[in-house]
Every structure is written in C-alpha cells, then in structure tokens.
UniProtKB/Swiss-Prot annotation:
Belongs to the sugar phosphate cyclases superfamily. Dehydroquinate synthase family. One of its GO terms (biological process) is chorismate biosynthetic process. It comes from Clostridium perfringens (strain ATCC 13124 / DSM 756 / JCM 1290 / NCIMB 6125 / NCTC 8237 / Type A). HAMAP family: DHQ_synthase. Signal peptide: none annotated. It is found in: Cytoplasm. This is 3-dehydroquinate synthase. Pathway: Metabolic intermediate biosynthesis; chorismate biosynthesis; chorismate from D-erythrose 4-phosphate and phosphoenolpyruvate: step 2/7. The gene is aroB. GO terms for molecular function: 3-dehydroquinate synthase activity; metal ion binding; nucleotide binding. Keywords: Amino-acid biosynthesis, Aromatic amino acid biosynthesis, Cobalt, Cytoplasm, Lyase, Metal-binding, NAD, Nucleotide-binding, Zinc. Its main location: cytoplasm.
Length: 350
C-alpha cells in the first residue's frame, strides 16, 4: 500500500493506492466519515460491474447507501443532468452531514464533485477513480466542473475530497481505448515534470510491461500532481503546466462534439501538435516533439488531426481557462521533463 498526503492550507487529505482496495472501501470511508448516509454517484457501466458489491461493502460498515447512476460519457457532465441527481439526493434525504462518493472515471468524478460542491452549499465527498485517467490525474487536486455547449469545464470550482481511494486492479475492466486514454495523461507528467518517468515509459518493451508496473506509475503521477497542487492550489501559476496539451486538446474535443476523441486522446494530439509548433518557433529543444510523438505511437495514441474549420478552433482556444487579462498562457517544454508557461496570444496557433 502507498499513501500520499496532499497538504493544503484549508484542507488536507490522503491518496491511498493499493491493489484490491475495493474490498476495504467501507473501512477506509469510516476513517474520515462518521455520518449516516452515503450517496454513490456512478455511471451505468460501472454500476453493472461494481455497484452492488461496493454498496454492500459500505453498508457492512453501518452506512445507509443509495446509488445514483448516469449515462456514461462526457455528455452527462452537463447542467441538464444535474436536476435529476439533485432530486434523487433530496428523495434520499441527504443532509450536509452526509457523504457523496464519486465512483467512476473523469466524467463521474467531475460531475459528482460539482454536485457535492453545490448541493446544500457543500457536502463532503470521496473520490474512487476507476479509470487510469482519473487515477493519475482528475481525482486529485480539487477541480470539479460541468461543461457548457461552448466549451469544457466552463462552470466549476475548487472543491477537494476527504479522501481518494485508488485500486489499480479496477483498471482490469477498462476497455483498451480508455486505458490508452489515461496513458495520454501519464505521458504528460513525464513531459512536464519527470524526465525519469518519460524514460521509464520509453524503456518498457510494450504496454503489457507497463501494466505490470501500473501501481508505481500511478503513484509517480499522483506524487507529481500533489507537489504542483500544494504549490499552486488555485491554478494561477505553476499548476497551469498540468494543462500541457490541453489548449489544443479541449479544442479538438469540442470540434468533434466530444464523440470522436476521448480526453486523453485529444490531449495526446495536443501535446504532439504544440511541441511541433514550439520547435518551429525555437521555444522547445529540437528533437523533443519527435520523442513525444514516438512514445505516443508506441502506446497506441493518435498524434495528429485535421481541423478544417480554423474559426471553430480559434473560438475554442479563446475560451481556454488559462487565458488571463486578454493573454493566452500556453504550456510548452524547454526539454523533456521541463514544462513552462509561455505568455502569448491566440495568433500563436496560426
């Protein structure tokens, strides 16, 4: 078992990483929550696989448990889904002394966290991430949000969980497409902060070799994010480097209506494209983009896309949350493991 402590001024919490942790979720929940009711927010796929077993595991610790399930996919992370969830919480008579659990990938984590931050002006919640992307990235750091038609994560807040429980074995039920999706974020961490992690990923013979070491990979990624979040909780400085590849990635997701490319796939394309642009402008060491593209391809990730409507891309980029005071903060690399913030304008991409 590995435990990381996220130390923040107003709230600190543990990230627990252990194989077969799902058999002990109830016990761990009891260490941070002494209320009565627990509402689990999940999606239909995960509910079919884990819902009943995890519900019983938590009930065995004396809690009253209700499971609320939504349709899988990014389109559930929207305002139209919220009233149904809020009403089910009201029917369950959930109070501010109770608990919400986010059981799922990045979409469920963002959605359930947003619900927890807004229902009754705030209810405690726990993250139980089940996808690789959520385990290495979105479950840690307190960002919760829903999407608007005009862009991703445009309405949200910073709302940290009481606890993050990560069972790497739960990745065994993940479709290969979504394992690859998470690898996009894993590679991102190597790019921005850890040359050692990047070289470790280069050194694995294949994806199966990586999977055998997945617990350690998850720990390394969470530790990098922990350090960055502790230094810049509200995303006004260093934390922006976690968005390497995301400016173009979010634009790609939006242009393709969140259907063609998953988040990690879009970020992978964004990392490759931005690195090539930066090399052309002598802002990144020559050869860096080639290494990134090679590693992305090694793990089955797309590296390029044809954006026919540049106007759509431009508008999506303008809505990027790293834009401050009319300027666009783009995340670039000096070299592998050395991310930095580059202040520019949207014309950078033209």
């Amino acid at each position: 078992m590995k435990v990381l402590r996220v130390n923040l001024d107003e709230k600190s919490y543990d990230i627990v990483i252990q194989k077969d942790l799902k058999d002990y979720f109830g016990e761990y929940i009891k260490t941070v929550f002494d209320g009565k009711k627990v509402a689990i927010i999940t999606d239909d796929n995960l509910n079919d696989i884990y819902g009943e077993a995890i519900k019983k595991n938590i009930e065995n610790e004396g809690f009253e448990v209700e499971v609320i399930s939504v349709t899988p996919g990014e389109k559930s992370k929207s305002f139209s889904v919220l009233p149904g969830i809020y009403n089910k919480l009201l029917d369950f008579k959930l109070t501010r002394s109770d608990l919400i659990i986010a059981l799922g990938g990045g979409v469920v984590g963002d959605l359930a966290g947003f619900v927890a931050s807004t229902f009754l002006r705030g209810i405690s919640f726990i993250q139980i991430p089940t996808s690789l992307l959520a385990q290495v990235d979105s479950s840690v750091g307190g960002k919760v949000a829903v999407d608007l038609e005009r862009g991703k994560n445009l309405v949200g807040s910073f709302y940290h969980p009481e606890l993050v429980l990560i069972d790497p074995n739960m990745l065994g039920t993940l479709p290969e497409k979504y394992f690859n999706d998470g690898l996009g974020e894993v590679i991102k961490y190597g790019c921005i902060k850890s040359k050692e992690l990047f070289e470790k990923l280069e050194g694995f013979e294949n994806k199966e070799d990586l999977k055998e070491n997945i617990g350690e990979i998850i720990y390394e990624c969470c530790n990098i994010k922990r350090e960055v979040v502790e230094n810049d909780e509200k995303d006004l400085g260093e934390r922006m480097i976690l968005n390497f590849g995301h400016t173009l990635g979010h634009a790609i997701e939006q242009i393709y209506n969140y259907e063609t490319y998953s988040h990690g796939e879009a970020v992978a394309i964004g990392m490759n494209m931005i690195s090539k642009i930066a090399e052309e402008k002598d802002l990144t060491k020559k050869g860096t983009a080639e290494r990134i593209e090679s590693l992305l391809k090694k793990y089955g990730l797309n590296t390029d896309v044809n954006i026919e409507d540049n106007g759509l891309a431009r508008e999506a980029i303008k809505l990027d949350k790293k834009n401050l005071n009319g300027n666009l903060n783009v995340i670039l690399l000096k070299d592998i493991g050395e991310g930095y913030i580059y202040n520019t304008t949207v014309e950078f991409f033209e």
